[in-house]
């Protein structure tokens, strides 16, 4: 028997507070302002701890993806905290619309709400693919533009903060600068400004200039890149505060931006036409959108580089990275993007990589862990460690595995190997691989 779950209606926009599970903290802080400008009352959740995972396990099958356990557990924990009026609260979950099980989280959440005794709490879907067309929450074009601006600004703030914080003379200066700019950009977004390409291109150099002004002392440090399943990659709840741990080990950390994943999802819609046929209008539309995003992204990266910071290549160059390694048709979960990000990190000097993945995430095991040996063969300096996250995995074991990777990185710090790919003849002759160590 099919249960008639409550829908989020347009009328609830004025009466209900929408709770949003946290993931990429800075980007989501700005996204909250974009939603508030559009008339939504919302709150990004910050509740963490083992109780969240245990609550998720109570209402969701333990074989379900780890991110689903955490997201549903976090939302239920917030509801049961007593902080919110359960008759005036709604929940929201992002959906990519792809083949990954993440597209089904929303149905698992609705079932969990019924089991937990909250059958009347509505759940809305945040997506760009037209799922749940009858929902009162719709991703309109103006809201989408403000959301995109929030991601661009958040990516830049995170990238610059992570390159300044390990070297700052006054501890906490980079974090204060992030807070300052989030507040400043939040006011701009609430005023209905700051989201056009012209405004973003004007703002990027100002952000870079302020971070450049922070006094630092540059000393050699281990540089670590983080890739993986999108939730576990960014969420401190999902990866046991991985960034904080790496920084406690005196590392500079690089998280490839969230906008790369957004562009990856858009690119895949057009790539489907190339691989399988279909409507040419879809391909033309996605190409046009990607061109617009590319223009903004290049301005952001130029502002970073002009201020003396490391800036990766734009998405259009990232698409070329996995050529000869994995097909662009591999697009379940993070797909070819994860492989491309690892190559980009190695080439950019972040050859020590943590690949964070949920234990049962099949796409990640293929495009992440499955590509490690091939990348090591091409780039012998690559020092990649896949780390599994699930309710039964202990934080101590995860951190000990990372420490082993960092021990190798610290040995190489004084005598770094150039991230130079081997020739085809060298690869054919048997490239070095740590899998045989």
Please name every model-derived segment.
Residues 1-437:
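An N-terminal assembly and electron-transfer interface module characteristic of large anaerobic redox
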């Amino acid at each position: 028997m099919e249960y008639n779950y409550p829908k989020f209606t347009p009328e609830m926009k004025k009466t209900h507070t929408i709770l949003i599970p946290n993931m990429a903290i800075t980007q989501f802080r700005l996204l909250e302002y974009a939603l508030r400008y559009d008339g939504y009352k919302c709150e990004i959740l910050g509740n963490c701890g083992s109780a969240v995972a245990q609550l998720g396990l109570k209402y969701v099958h333990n074989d379900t993806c780890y991110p689903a356990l955490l997201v549903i557990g976090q939302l239920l924990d917030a509801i049961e905290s007593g902080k919110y009026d359960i008759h005036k609260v709604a929940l929201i979950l992002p959906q990519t619309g792809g083949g990954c099980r993440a597209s089904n989280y929303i149905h698992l959440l609705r079932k969990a709400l019924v089991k937990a005794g909250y059958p009347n709490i509505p759940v809305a879907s945040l997506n760009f693919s037209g799922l749940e067309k009858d929902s009162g929450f719709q991703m309109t074009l103006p809201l989408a533009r403000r959301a995109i601006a929030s991601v661009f600004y958040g990516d830049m703030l995170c990238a610059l903060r992570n390159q300044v914080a390990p070297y700052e003379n006054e501890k906490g200066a980079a974090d204060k600068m992030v807070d300052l700019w989030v507040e400043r950009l939040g006011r701009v977004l609430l005023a209905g400004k700051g989201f056009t390409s012209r405004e973003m291109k004007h703002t990027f150099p100002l952000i870079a200039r302020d971070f450049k002004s922070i006094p630092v002392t540059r000393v050699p440090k281990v540089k670590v890149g983080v890739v993986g399943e999108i939730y576990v990659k960014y969420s401190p709840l999902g990866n046991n505060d991985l960034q904080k741990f790496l920084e406690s080990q005196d590392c500079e950390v690089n998280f490839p931006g969230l906008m790369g994943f957004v562009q990856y999802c858009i690119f895949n819609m057009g790539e489907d036409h190339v691989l399988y046929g279909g409507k040419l209008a879809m391909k033309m539309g996605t190409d046009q959108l990607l061109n617009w995003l590319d223009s903004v992204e290049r301005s952001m990266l130029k502002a970073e580089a002009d201020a003396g910071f490391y800036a990766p290549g734009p998405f259009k160059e990232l698409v070329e990275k996995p050529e000869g390694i994995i097909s662009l048709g591999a697009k379940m979960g993070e797909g070819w993007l994860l492989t491309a990000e690892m190559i980009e990190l190695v080439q950019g000097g972040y050859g020590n990589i943590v690949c964070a993945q949920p234990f049962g995430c099949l796409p990640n095991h293929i495009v992440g862990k499955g590509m490690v040996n091939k990348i090591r063969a091409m780039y012998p300096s690559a020092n990649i460690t896949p780390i599994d996250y699930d309710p039964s995995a202990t934080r101590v074991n995860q951190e000990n595995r990372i420490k082993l990777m960092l021990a190798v990185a610290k040995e190489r710090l004084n005598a770094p190997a150039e991230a130079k790919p081997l020739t085809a003849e060298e690869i054919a002759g048997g490239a070095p691989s740590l899998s045989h160590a």
